[in-house]
Regions:
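Catalytic cores and adjacent binding grooves of peptidoglycan-active enzymes
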Residues: 81-148
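A generic short-segment signal for beta-strand/edge and adjacent turn/coil regions
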Residues: 25-27, 54-66, 96-102
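Polar/charged alpha-helical tracts
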Residues: 4-8, 12, 74, 103-107
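Short amphipathic alpha-helical segments, especially helix-boundary/capping motifs
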Residues: 17-23, 69, 80-83
């Protein structure tokens, strides 16, 4: 699938305003898709449509914790040192999955990882499903679980 087809298919499940902070959406509207990486979007589509097959809600609050974050987001502004994350780079999202705990969702993704078009990371030990496609030097697993 090319990028346009991926976004068109994702529209069945998500609006871009759910995946980016309010600052980004208020400035760029539907063009906000441009800030989300194709590999992240493609994995998100496969996870939602083919693996989990259940509604996913992106954690989207005033602090923009689970979505693409920009320099205006409170969480970013409060940092006292250099701050880069997969969220800032348009390669991550935090979700809740209707009908599944985060651990159940992570387990299902690991079991069906052969369907994923790109390697990805998941955050373990948290009550939400964090997924990202931030490349990891020296990590060869298709699905890598990290804890911070």
């Amino acid at each position: 699938m090319n990028r346009e087809q991926i976004i068109r298919e994702l529209h069945r499940f998500f609006q871009v305003r759910e995946l980016v902070c309010s600052h980004v959406f208020s400035k760029w509207g539907e063009r906000s898709w441009q800030f989300l990486s194709t590999d992240y979007l493609h994995n998100l589509l496969v996870i939602r449509r083919d693996i989990l097959q259940m509604p996913m809600v992106c954690s989207h609050d005033a602090g923009a914790h689970g979505v693409l974050r920009c320099n205006m987001c409170k969480m970013v502004k409060e940092k006292k040192a250099a701050y880069l994350s997969s969220h800032i780079l348009g390669r991550a999202g935090d979700f809740s999955v209707q009908g599944l705990t985060a651990q159940e969702a992570r387990s299902r993704i690991r079991t069906m990882q052969n369907l994923l078009p790109y390697p990805m990371r998941m955050e373990g030990g948290v009550s939400w499903l964090h997924i990202d496609t931030l490349p990891q030097f020296g990590i060869t697993e298709k699905v890598y679980e990290f804890t911070e």
